[in-house]
Every structure is written in structure tokens, then in C-alpha cells.
Amino acid sequence: MGVGGGEMTLHASSASQLPSNPYQSMCKTNRSGKASLLSHQQMEQFLSNLPVKYGLLAELMYFSAGRVKEITTLKVRNINIKDELLTIEKSSTKTKETRQIPLPPRLVKSLGIWIQENQLETDDFIFFTDSRNMNVRRGEKSISTQSVDTFFRKAFDWIGIEGASTHSFRRTRLTELHVDEGWSLREIMDISGHKSIISLQQYLDTDKKNTFEKYRNLFQREEV
């Protein structure tokens, strides 16, 4: 299922669609706040302006709710095409624990095509660096988290999405699971990889006004 309950369309575009002139770096509020959440419309708009590699990166970060390092260091062996399952190895996770996450069939198919077209081997990085200054073969070295962060900030800036970063995909997805889908914090932890509920709660964005209203409605039902 894509964003908004429908199909989230990935448009393969050219990197030249992004202006070549320098950008003002996008940042979190005062560099100490949380990355902005993305609406379904913003997600669609963002994906439609990305080259295939970065589009796949963005979709994987969203659907897996993974950290940027976890996704940039994925290898071909981490995608189970048959079972439509992603394995994030403990060597890449913040908690040093391996976890598995289901992926939507369409995204798995797109990843399979990407892997095949680039002739990647089992131990190759899916999102490899293609820098001409590095004497490495395709798939041998992963793209850096810094280059992904820089690219995405420029893309967000160009289309006018304020306060967003690579962290927005993870935070948006976890908030949707909790607020829109009604998942418990314990259930979300199986996807997010958080070790504690407290650390997970810091990621989630809830509507305090709506929370207060629900609590007042409880008073009425209890007749207190």
C-alpha cells in the first residue's frame, strides 16, 4: 500500500531536474527540533522529482521506517524478493540487533529491476556510489549518508518543503502507524527498532488538541 492508502508512484527522472546552483541548506528547527512530517501530497511531489536511485532510497526509508544509515548500507542479500522482506543487519543498526520488515510488492519489484539492471551481486551495496573520483566497481562501495542528506535537503528546498530531512520519512511513517492506524507503541517498536518506548515517543507527532478532546469525552462517558 502506498502513501494515502493508494499507489505511491515513483517517477524515474533525471538528476538534471534539480537546479545546479547552490542551495541554502534545509535544517530542522534551530537544528535541535524534529524533522518535519510529510503529507501524502508532499511525498508524491517529492518522489516525482527524484532520479530512480534516490526515489528508491526515499521509498525504502519511508516504508521500512529505517534510519538513513540502515538503508544506505543495504546489500542485495538483504532483500528477499520472494518473501517481500527486508533484513536490516545488526552491523548497521543503532541497537546492534537485526530486524526484518515487510515491504510492499511494488517496491520489491522496483528494487529487483534496479538490482538486475545494474548487474549487482549478492554482496553488493544496492545504493552504491558512482563517483568518478573513486576507483571502485559498481556496488562495491555504498553511497554516503552525508551525500544522501545533502541531496534530499536540496530537493526538499527546491520544491518548498520546509524543515524536512532524511529523518522525515522515518518519523512520518511511525507517526502514521500510531496516530492513523492505531498501532500500539510495542507493535511499532518491532518495525522501528527502538529499544525503549520513551525513545520511540520522541519520534511521534500527536495532536494535543485532539488528545485533550478524547480525554474530555472519556469524562462524559464516566459521568464525572
Positions of predicted regions on the chain:
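DNA breakage-rejoining catalytic core of tyrosine-based enzymes
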Residues: L18-M43, K94-P105, L120-D124, K214
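C-terminal secondary-structure termini that scaffold catalytic or DNA-interacting sites
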Residues: M1-L37, L218-V224
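Basic, Lys/Arg- and aromatic-enriched nucleic-acid-binding interface segment
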Residues: S36-V68
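C-terminal catalytic core of tyrosine-transesterase DNA break-rejoin enzymes
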Residues: F63, T172-S192, Q201
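Short, charged phosphate-coordinating catalytic segments
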Residues: M61-K82, R186
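C-terminal catalytic core of Y-nucleophile DNA break-rejoin enzymes
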Residues: T93-I113, D124-R153
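Catalytic-site neighborhood detector that most strongly recognizes the C-terminal catalytic loop/helix
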Residues: S92, S192-N217
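Conserved tyrosine-mediated DNA breakage-rejoining catalytic core shared by Y-recombinases
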Residues: T73-L107
